[in-house]
């Protein structure tokens, strides 16, 4: 096999979906090392290994624009639930990233002193997929100010900019903000513009979980556009949605608003996950002032009668906004006596406690550390379908790869963690015909790569990195549900990452070829 013309891997007889949105065509794909070196009729070209893709689509590997598997990869690098969806790269760093952190706030396997330290460890250990990391906008604020609700001084702002500069030179692809969580909710727009200007200097991007996705979504989008305009940085809105029944049906207006920003010259776009429910910490229901100082201080305020009354009033409004059966509790921490309330709606928990919904919520807050996890059924399916049809919408699961232990214990999670990409292809493209499968692939590949500024990925093209998925267009579909969220999808048979198969004939290979994808500002040895 020393012949220079011999391929390391050949994918034959496939229907090639190249990532541009163009119709599929028949052909073979030749790989040498980590690159695609030939596409066409390769029947006479020898290869060390061959994948027969008869009757299946061969496409660029899917890029998840919002994942949470970055630290899971340290403990469980196989990341099988992501691989089985066809994901080959995950963009992570919504609000927080594994580094940088204060020296007194490091935790093995969770937090590193710098983002570069984390990326280096990821490269040493390997993973089944690649990771492109945004620096969490909360990280420099937490290092410099902590969880306090105040504006940084000029000196503190300079330090936050310095921290951002270092993260960009260590390989961050940009900034990721999540403005409904402590301490990011206390960030001013000017503060976000300042650190985004630093990222823009290195060709970075700005991704954001905006401040509001319901009543104040217009002003939240205006803030994101202002950051893009003044920092001269591309903006991508994470998991675009309209939360709250009172606001359902507004998605056409919101898409028009983003389109108007694009027409103005702002490089604005968004991503979605294909579900009419979200998942996060229950503490997002609490008013901003109550969360100042962090969750510990919030729990203390629940013991103050005056504060408790104001918190209860805010919680009643939040419950009403979501409607009946709108809040489903999935995980409660550190309080075994409350475990029986997992996998229950808040109305049922309140009935069992013989109290009101707001009092039941405060009982959960008081005894769970950290905040309980919940699923909010507060999104309209019509709005999901409308958003998916905008051509500049990409896909982000907002899910981390569940571990084997979580599956064994049947831990309640959102099915987006295990089904997002096959659901878009099987349900919305094949069954609902919102767009062609080729167009769905474009959203998940070349468009996603462009949004994250990932070079040489997202297309089946000679010279590009060999991140490839092989799937059956007639059978691919998600199988996970809210009741049974760990069921794997069907239809993805083979996944190649950096030229190495990680899924072969439906079986995991155990290989860990994934690596960090460093941003354009990386000052070390250049990695593609």
Regions found by a protein language model. Name each.
Residues 122, 128-154, 160-181, 196, ...:
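Active-site neighborhoods of metal-dependent hydrolases
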Residues 304, 386-392, 397-398, 413, ...:
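C-terminal cap of metal-dependent C-N hydrolases
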Residues 44-45, 50-117:
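Metal-associated gating/positioning segment near the N- to mid-region
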